[in-house]
Amino acid sequence: MESFSELSLQFSQLSMFPFFETAHYLTSVMSAREQAGAVDVASRSPLASWFSSMLYCFGGGILSSILLAEPPVGILSNTTSIILASAVWYMVYYFPYDLFYNCFFFLPIRLILAGMKEVTRTWKILSGVAHAHSHYKDAMLVMITIGWARGAGGGLISNFEQLVRGVWKPESNEFLKMSYPVKVTLIGAVLFTLQHGQYLPISRHNLMFIYTLFLILIKVTMMLTRSTASPFLPLETSLQHILFSRQQIPAEVRESPSSSGDKGKPSKKTLDKDSGEQDNKKDN
């Protein structure tokens, strides 16, 4: 147990720059390139392509700044990160014969990059929770919101990023169809906020290590199996059925629309019977 605690403590002291941050920029820009029409936008408007990629890379910081009424352009003050992300963007889109992109598209390398990106997700959630706590002491809902925004901002502002590329898909709103990264980031924000308030009986570095291992394991599994379904789907379906499903009226109990207006009127069968009796009387 002591060795695990020491390992998790050393893990929590890792520096994200430059290797993990570079992996984050690589995976983010490659994801941006793989969107429909992104390559065409890069050939027609490099500025729009660059801005779109920067939203993928720094969307979390931009969104959290907006929510806390801070200047969203403050992200530009980190010149080193902007230059590094811009260099990655240029290499991914404009390197001759796409050699740079194809090199990092190789599955084993991409698995490593994806795992490193999940490490940065944990750090971003933590920084968001701590940043919100510095503004609003022990405001758990604010801490969860900012941690969520900092860790999954690129997904949460995806509609705005699409507008930059000239695409408008309101049905792809993350609040309507929440993707797995956004869901798991929200769970992480809740866990780290509860731990920060000492509502969870676990140290921060142990929670960081366990949560990051979970992220990496699920991400690698989804990439190897090429699955896009959320691993939380069975639980979500059960909870939705129990808590949020409307009670359905059995079909045999429902009345037809015309039945309410026919109350008090004799049925067609009765009318036919009565008319038949009248005809018999006439014949007699």
Swiss-Prot record:
Transmembrane residue ranges: 16-32, 45-68, 80-99, 103-121, 140-157, 179-196, 205-225
GO CC entries: endoplasmic reticulum; endoplasmic reticulum membrane
InterPro entries for this protein: TRIC_channel (IPR007866)
Cytoplasmic side: 33-44, 100-102, 158-178, 226-284
Pfam families named among the record's database cross-references: TRIC
Keywords for the protein's UniProt record, in alphabetical order: Endoplasmic reticulum, Ion channel, Ion transport, Membrane, Potassium, Potassium channel, Potassium transport, Transmembrane, Transmembrane helix, Transport
Residue span of region Disordered: 250-284
Membrane topology, record value: Multi-pass membrane protein
GO biological process, any: regulation of release of sequestered calcium ion into cytosol
Predominant localisation class: endoplasmic reticulum
Amino-acid positions noted as binding a 1,2-diacyl-sn-glycero-3-phospho-(1D-myo-inositol-4,5-bisphosphate) in the UniProt annotation, renumbered to this chain: 117, 121
Enzymatic reactions: K(+)(in) = K(+)(out)
UniProt biased composition (Basic and acidic residues): 262-284
Lumenal side: 1-15, 69-79, 122-139, 197-204
Family: Belongs to the TMEM38 family.
UniProt subunit comment: Homotrimer; conformation seems to be controled by binding to diacylglycerol (DAG).
Protein name: Trimeric intracellular cation channel type B
Lineage: Eukaryota, Metazoa, Chordata, Craniata, Vertebrata
Gene: tmem38b
